[in-house]
Amino acid sequence: MAELHWPRIKQILDDGMERWKQANNRNPAMKVAHDGQIGWETKEELAESNPYGKQLIESDKVGNDRAEETNLIRILRGPIGGFRRMPSRGPYLAPNEISEIAQWINAGMPD
């Protein structure tokens, strides 16, 4: 499988948000809804996202086949620790899209 890079991951996340906006007929207010601690304009911003004190991509899980343990992948697949599956109320990312994000994290989050 070809190595995944940041532009593809950003596209997956942006497309998912666009589908959410269309389905829910409103803007998601990400900064308000997540205590101002989530974003993905850059891969660094995504890596540093820490909504409600939960690091989305813990650095010790990058590049070592532990992406499935990250809060990002866990919350995209289903609810965790009292937090509902994201994006809230769907539509959710497709399983193959989540798998691509996990592969990217496992590959060390290449640019």
Where are these regions (language model features)?
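Solvent-exposed helix-loop boundary motif
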Residues: 2-92
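Short, well-ordered beta-strand segments
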Residues: 12, 102-108
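Secondary-structure-rich domain cores
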Residues: 84, 108-109
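Short, solvent-exposed alpha-helical surface patches in well-structured domains
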Residues: 71, 100-103
